[in-house]
């Protein structure tokens, strides 16, 4: 379409994760059909989100207070699970199988050779010292593996028990389509 306003909105909507050109066009035309009040509510929700959501001072969990409800909850056990994002942690929380606390690192280490000391290192070391077990739950990407190994080394240096989530074959998968690294991990982590 050759309309600068629609094209500009489509361009900006495509910056959202998982939104391609088709989805951005759909959202744009949906918004055009809405009355001004409804569009304003959406805009205000986004502005309020940016103004009021911040990181917990202890664990970096995104929420609206200086200290998140997980950190304040004294009934949680002495386990700490480390994630890259708050949304990853929430997915695990919704399972209802974990009653510990969380730490969000936000930035993965991208390259072993050029690994500068991550900004979160000191905060993690300080916070993790309060727990009996640290569980690393980063995505199994190359950067996730590099970061997991780094975290394991720095936390074991201060005598903390560190474990990682097991990796292996996903349910409903076929071995023929599984990459060699995942096959190897599933073999090594067999029960």
Curated annotation (Swiss-Prot):
Write down the species.
Mycoplasmopsis pulmonis (strain UAB CTIP)
> Which Pfam families does the entry mention?
RecR_C (PF21175), RecR_HhH (PF21176), Toprim_4 (PF13662)
Keywords linked to the UniProt accession: DNA damage, DNA recombination, DNA repair, Metal-binding, Zinc, Zinc-finger
PROSITE patterns linked to this entry: TOPRIM
The cross-references to CDD domains, in alphabetical order and at most eight, read:
TOPRIM_recR
- GO terms (BP aspect): DNA recombination; DNA repair
Q: Which GO terms describe its molecular function?
A: DNA binding; zinc ion binding
The disulfide bridges present are none
- Zn finger limits (C4-type): 56-71
> What is the protein named?
Recombination protein RecR
The Toprim domain, residue ranges: 78-170
In UniProt terms, what function does this protein have?
May play a role in DNA repair. It seems to be involved in an RecBC-independent recombinational process of DNA repair. It may act with RecF and RecO.
What family is it from?
Belongs to the RecR family.
């Amino acid at each position: 379409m050759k309309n600068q306003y629609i094209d500009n909105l489509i361009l900006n909507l495509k910056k959202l994760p998982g939104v391609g050109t088709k989805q951005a066009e759909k959202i744009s035309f949906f918004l055009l059909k809405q009355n001004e009040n409804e569009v304003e509510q959406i805009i205000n929700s986004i502005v309020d989100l940016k103004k009021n959501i911040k990181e917990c001072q202890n664990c970096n969990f995104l929420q609206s207070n200086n200290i998140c409800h997980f950190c304040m909850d004294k009934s949680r056990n002495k386990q700490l699970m480390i994630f890259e994002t708050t949304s990853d942690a929430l997915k695990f929380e919704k399972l209802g199988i974990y009653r510990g606390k969380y730490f969000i690192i936000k930035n993965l280490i991208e390259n072993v050779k050029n690994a500068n000391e991550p900004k979160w290192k000191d905060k993690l070391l300080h916070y993790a010292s309060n727990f009996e077990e640290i569980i690393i739950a980063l995505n199994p990407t190359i950067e996730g593996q590099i970061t997991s190994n780094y975290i394991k080394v720095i936390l074991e240096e201060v005598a903390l028990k560190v474990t990682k989530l097991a990796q292996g074959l996903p349910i409903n998968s076929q071995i023929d389509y599984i990459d060699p690294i995942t096959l190897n991990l599933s073999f090594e982590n067999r029960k």
